[in-house]
UniProtKB/Swiss-Prot annotation:
Its main location: plastid. It is found in: Plastid, Chloroplast. GO terms for cellular component: chloroplast; ribosome; small ribosomal subunit. One of the primary rRNA binding proteins, it binds directly to 16S rRNA where it nucleates assembly of the head domain of the 30S subunit. PROSITE patterns: RIBOSOMAL_S7 (PS00052). The keyword Ubl conjugation does not apply. PANTHER family: RIBOSOMAL PROTEIN S7. The gene is rps7-A. It comes from the Eukaryota. Part of the 30S ribosomal subunit. This is Small ribosomal subunit protein uS7cz/uS7cy. Belongs to the universal ribosomal protein uS7 family. The lineage of its organism: Eukaryota, Viridiplantae, Streptophyta, Embryophyta, Tracheophyta.
Length: 155
């Protein structure tokens, strides 16, 4: 048995302008090669574009998009008796948000467009409306979990 204590779970800090943890999570996820100022720049430009497109609070659009993309359940590969089964498992809120942010950024990177701020803003607006690649990814994950429901007892 380990003598070390359990590590305290870190809480995400909030960003300087919107004072929001989700924005900070998004910034940390979009970050490449340690260029955090560029990541902030991209996010804030995307927020401005959302403000112009929808004429609503960009934070509420972001929250709605993440709420729409967050999965409730996912599948995990589990090896049982020589064969690998996709076992459906429930996802906690923190992990669900992290997955949602990852899917939103992945979908926006695949989008055709001028720059990342434009692509991200378009994807967030689409996700808030209930369409877009990230929403499709969530639905696909839920379908996979539903199809493999028979293996739920392997948890």
């Amino acid at each position: 048995m380990s003598r070390r204590g359990t590590a305290e779970e870190k809480t995400a800090k909030s960003d300087p302008i919107y004072r929001n943890r989700l924005v900070n999570m998004l910034v940390n996820r979009i970050l490449k090669h340690g260029k955090k100022s560029l990541a902030y720049q991209i996010i804030y430009r995307a927020m401005k574009k959302i403000q112009q497109k929808t004429e609503t609070n960009p934070l509420s659009v972001l929250r709605q998009a993440i709420r729409g993309v967050t999965p409730d359940i996912a599948v995990k590969a589990r090896r049982v008796g020589g064969s690998t089964h996709q076992v459906p498992v429930e996802i906690g809120s923190t992990q669900g948000k992290a997955l949602a942010i990852r899917w939103l950024l992945g979908a926006s990177r695949k989008r055709p467009g001028r720059n990342m701020a434009f692509k991200l803003s378009s994807e967030l607006v689409d996700a808030a409306k209930g369409s877009g690649d990230a929403i499709r990814k969530k639905e696909e994950t839920h379908r996979m979990a539903e199809a493999n429901r028979a293996f739920a007892h392997f948890r």
